[in-house]
Structure formats: C-alpha cells, structure tokens
C-alpha cells in the first residue's frame, strides 16, 4: 500500500470509500450457468436479470421530525424501472451517501462497487445520511446516539412498507456503518431480516480507551474529518432541493454538531457520564450493552473482519455470543483492505438465502472462515465449526534472559529493566490501513525489551487470541504497557503480528457478564483504578488482538514490551521518564500464552 498523508487518505477513504473490491460479473439471463455456491464463489442460483438501475433521492421524516436524506437505486430492464416488489438493502452512512468531487458525482455504488451486481440480481439498494451529516438535517450528538438508533429503526420500517419493496430488508456497510447495523438489530424492526456488518466493533470503551489508554490521535483525526464533511464539504442535495436551500439549511444545523474528541477526552472511565447529555456513553450507545436484544431479534448476522483491523477482537466476541443464524469471516486485512475474497459473492449468497428464500447451501457450510497469514496461497483460507478453534492448544512461552521458550523459569531474582522512551511507536495506526504500513520493527524494539525464541525447527501456526501475563513494577505511580507479538526472519528483520496494551492502574479484572472467550476483562470503572506502589511488582494480564499466523520454520517468535506508542496513544509524559521492570523469576514468572494449532 502506498504511503500518503494520513489525513488526506482518511478523508478519501471515508468519503469515497474506494477500496479494491472484486465485483462479480453479471450473467445474462439467457445464459445457463452452472450452480456454484461455496465460500467466495456464487453463480447459477439467482440470475442478473436486470440490465441497469435508476437513482433517485428524497427526504424521509423520522419520529422526531428530523428529515434524513435517502438515495434509492432501483433495477431497470431496457431503461424501465421494474414494477416487481424486491428486497431492499440499505446502509446508515456517516460519511455522505453521495457527493460531487471535481465535477463527478460519487454514490454508494462507488464506495461498494459490488452493489451494482446486487442491483442486477433484483434488489433495491439504499443509502441514508445519518442525522447531522451529509444532506440530512439534525445534530450529531455523539457516536451511535439513541436518536441515531431510533432513526435506523424508522428507516428500516419505511423501506419495508414501500410499494416497490417485498417487505424484506437487509443492511450492509463497514466500520461506523457496521456499528449501526448491530444497534438497528437491537431494536428488532419487524422488516429487518438480515445484516452484514464488516469491520465493525461492539465495545466503544475498548475502541476509545483500549486497556484504559486513550486512543486520542485517531479520535481527534476522526473528529476533524467529520467536521469537514458535515460543514465544509457538503454532500449532494436531494432531488427536490433544486436551489440548494434545503442543503444549506441542513448544514446550518450541522454547525451545532458535537465533537467526538471533546466528548471522549472527558470520559476516561467506562462509567463516566457525559455532562451535556447525562448519558453513560460506553453503556448506552454501544452494541455490547444490547447483546440480549440482538440475540432476541434472531436477525441473521454475517460478521466480516480482518486480522489487522482494530475491531477484529470485537467481531470474534460478538460471533461467539450470538445465537442468531450467523457466519464469521476473518481475512488478511486492515480496516480498509478487501482483497483475497469476492465480497459481492458473499453478500449475494447471504441475501439470496435470507431475503429471497433461495436455498444456496450457505447455512450448511462451516460457520467460520479464516485466512492463515504466511500459509501457502492454496491452503490459506480454512474453515471451522466454532471460534475459538476447538483444536487450539494454549501454550505458554516463558520470558527468559532475552529468550522465549516453553520451559518455566526456576531461578530467583531474574528481571529486565528499561527506561520508557516516549518516542516509541509502530506506525501511525496501521490497523486502519489508511496509507500506513507495518514497518520493520527492529528500531522500535530497541526502545523497550524483547524476548525471542531460537529459530523454529518447524512451522508453528498460531490462530486465536494471544494473552500476555507480565509481572511488572515501575519507579512511578502508573505505567502504560504495550505488548507486541512479532515474527523475526533469518535476516533478523522483525514483522508485526499483533499487539495489546494496558494502563497498569486499570489492571483490575471482573466478570463482564457475557462470554469473553476466557480473555481478561478490565472493567475500567473509576472505582477500579489502583495506582502502583513504586518498585512493587504487580501482575498484568493483557490480551492481544487475535491473529492467524503461520510462523515459518527457521523464523523466530518475539515478544516486545514498550512504555509508549506515540502515534496512537496518549501516554502522560513524566520527567524523568520512569523505569519499568519486567520480572521473570520462579515466583513471579512472565509469559506469553499462544493458541497453537497442531504439533
């Protein structure tokens, strides 16, 4: 992926969302097609009987009187809109449903090119500007507010009763547009029959304060981006707005939008209350709170994510907690990458089954598909009947004298010490995939401590959720601890595999009230915060983002610990910088637990 300024690439990704998606080729209705329905491949079960579409736009008024801008795409034959009642698939858009850029109009079909094939197969496609954004009226109150969720219900039901609708509605979209699907499902709208959230999250607190550490750089960038989109870079007006006065009036309301960065900076704990709204944002505006309601909805849910995306942990947890009809696919992607799979085929298989009643076999397949990074291309995609994989062996790799191995320490007094280097960083959040790659990590590793295995005698597959157990002390009252899992090749170059992080004062654990796959749950309540006693060791349990990686024979596995991640986290800087000590003695052993597959 080419490098470019982060802000510009984020803006382009959010507004145009032009990603490298494979588009299923349309099959003429006169051509007999072999029936194929397997993971990533689909033909012969439904035909591309339409040859085009028409776009229209209008306002729809929701329950509180707010007008939302809606784009509708309806299939055509020989230029004539079909009179057939068809299923509808829609997205609740935060980054403008349509815009004009350098004289060209961009719509949702540019963001998701495979939707053109969905239209040809007999679906109505819709995109709706969220309140306070695009051409919609209203005010942005914060991410996934109660009003936004009300809107999702109202739009779903409006789409379900239109004369051109079959009454069966689905949802699609990635990132913010995936969160909104979970929240829509939690309201159980009668016409919502299937959702397909891509790279979406479940726990807002873990997104903003992962391990209790503020992810400020990204949320500040995001807030600036949406401010520009909402106020300075207007969306395309709806058809009825011939003179642009409606759009101008909507943008005037957007000027009262709240800043997400201002909201979250003032809410450092899971139970923090937003002063302006009186809401516990991390409780009331986040999907994980509504697991019970989403389960009760029974709405079929296809979860899709990437190993190098920031939300992959959440998607795996959601999948395991839902008893809805469900599927989980995890590929070799960051937040914005989309290769190695025909996304259009998977969406069409899902919607044909649930919105048209076509028995294409998708529900008889293994429910989990995952890509093993580093495996031969022919065998990289694999399937399983459950997540985590039933075949995983939780294997402890103990920290030694710069070594990492499977033999527990027996000596006493063993420890490693370093001074926090606040310049440490991997890259400006490469998990978003917005122009920043994962660099070679040797220089980064030198700013902390590393422990490395000998060269592997054979390949080792790690598929699942790594967990670090560290005994750590500090010369200060707190510490931000960043843990990295890496693969080191024969030349000594180190490649990023995964990471986890935890503020030491946020180390308390509790029962989350749902299945967290055996991972540590740090509740992050204000009352849970416990400062360190200088030079007194405490145990930290830190889960890393899940991965599926084949460590090659001859390569080495490395664990690195640093005390900062400058580009991605707001770690308070102290002078002098504190010393951190990682203990690895018999009574206070530290280790990395890896989910090893096979021998």
Located regions from the model:
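C-terminal, loop-rich substrate-recognition/catalytic regions characterized by aromatic stacking residues
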Residues: 28-30, 251, 338-599
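Alpha/beta-hydrolase fold nucleophile elbow
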Residues: 163-175
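Accessory cap/linker subdomain of secreted extracellular hydrolases
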Residues: 28, 43, 108-112, 120, ...
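Conserved alpha/beta-hydrolase "acid-adjacent" motif
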Residues: 310-315
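Short glycine-enriched nucleophile-adjacent loop
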Residues: 177-189, 470
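N-terminal cap/lid segment of alpha/beta-hydrolase-fold proteins
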Residues: 39-84, 452, 456-458
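Cap/lid segment of the alpha/beta-hydrolase catalytic domain
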Residues: 79-160, 489-490, 518, 566
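Short beta-strand/loop motif that positions the catalytic acidic residue
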Residues: 297, 303-305
């Amino acid at each position: 992926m080419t490098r470019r300024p982060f802000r510009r690439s984020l803006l382009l990704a959010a507004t145009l969302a032009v990603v490298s998606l494979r588009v299923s080729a349309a099959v003429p209705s006169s051509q007999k097609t072999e029936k194929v329905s397997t993971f990533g491949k689909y033909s012969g079960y439904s035909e591309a009987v339409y040859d085009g579409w028409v776009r229209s736009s209008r306002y729809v008024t929701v329950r509180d009187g707010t007008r939302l801008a809606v784009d509708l795409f309806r299939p055509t034959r020989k230029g004539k809109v079909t009179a057939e009642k068809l299923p509808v698939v829609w997205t609740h858009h935060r980054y403008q449903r349509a815009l004009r850029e350098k004289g060209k109009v961009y719509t949702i079909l540019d963001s998701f090119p495979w939707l053109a094939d969905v239209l040809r197969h007999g679906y109505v496609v819709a995109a709706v500007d969220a309140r306070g954004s695009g051409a919609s009226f209203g005010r942005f109150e914060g991410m996934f507010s109660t009003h936004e969720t009300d809107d999702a219900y109202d739009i779903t039901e409006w789409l379900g009763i239109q004369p051109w609708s079959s009454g069966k509605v689905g949802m699609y979209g990635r990132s913010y547009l995936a969160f909104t699907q979970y929240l829509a499902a939690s309201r159980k709208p009668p016409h919502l029959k299937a959702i397909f959230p891509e790279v979406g999250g479940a726990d807002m607190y873990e997104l903003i304060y992962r391990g209790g550490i503020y992810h400020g750089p990204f949320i500040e960038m995001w807030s600036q981006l949406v401010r520009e989109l909402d106020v300075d870079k207007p969306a395309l007006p709806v058809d009825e707005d011939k003179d642009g006065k409606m759009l101008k009036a909507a943008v005037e309301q957007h000027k009262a939008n709240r800043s997400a960065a201002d909201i979250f900076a003032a809410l450092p704990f899971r139970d923090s209350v937003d002063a302006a709204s009186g809401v516990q944002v991390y409780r009331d505006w986040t999907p994980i709170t509504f697991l019970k309601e989403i389960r009760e909805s029974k709405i079929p849910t296809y979860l899709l994510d990437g190993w190098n995306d920031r939300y992959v942990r959440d998607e795996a947890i959601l999948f395991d907690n839902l008893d809805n009809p469900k599927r989980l696919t995890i590929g070799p992607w960051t937040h914005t990458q989309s290769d190695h799979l025909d996304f259009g085929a998977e969406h069409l298989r899902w919607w044909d089954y649930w919105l048209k009643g076509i028995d294409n076999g998708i529900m008889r397949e293994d429910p989990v598909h995952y890509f093993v990074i580093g495996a031969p291309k022919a065998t990289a995609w694999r399937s399983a009947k459950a997540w985590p994989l039933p075949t995983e062996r939780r294997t402890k790799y103990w920290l030694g004298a710069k070594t990492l191995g499977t033999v527990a320490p027996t000596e006493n007094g063993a420890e490693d010490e370093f001074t926090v280097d606040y310049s440490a960083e991997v890259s400006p959040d490469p998990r978003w995939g917005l122009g920043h790659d994962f660099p070679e990590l040797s220089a980064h590793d030198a700013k902390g401590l590393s422990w490395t295995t000998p060269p592997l005698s054979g390949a080792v597959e790690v598929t699942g959720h790594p967990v670090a157990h560290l005994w750590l002390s500090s010369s200060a009252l707190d510490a931000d601890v960043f843990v990295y899992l890496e693969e080191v090749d024969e030349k000594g170059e180190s490649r990023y595999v995964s990471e986890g992080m935890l503020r030491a004062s946020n180390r308390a654990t509790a029962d989350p009230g749902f299945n967290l796959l055996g991972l540590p749950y740090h509740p992050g309540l204000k009352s849970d915060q416990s400062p360190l006693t200088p030079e007194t060791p405490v145990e930290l349990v830190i889960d890393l983002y899940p991965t599926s990686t084949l460590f090659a024979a001859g390569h080495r596995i490395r664990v690195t610990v640093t005390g900062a991640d400058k580009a991605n986290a707001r770690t308070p800087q102290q002078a002098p910088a504190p010393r951190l000590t990682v203990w690895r003695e018999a009574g206070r052993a530290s280790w990395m637990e890896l989910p090893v597959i096979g021998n």
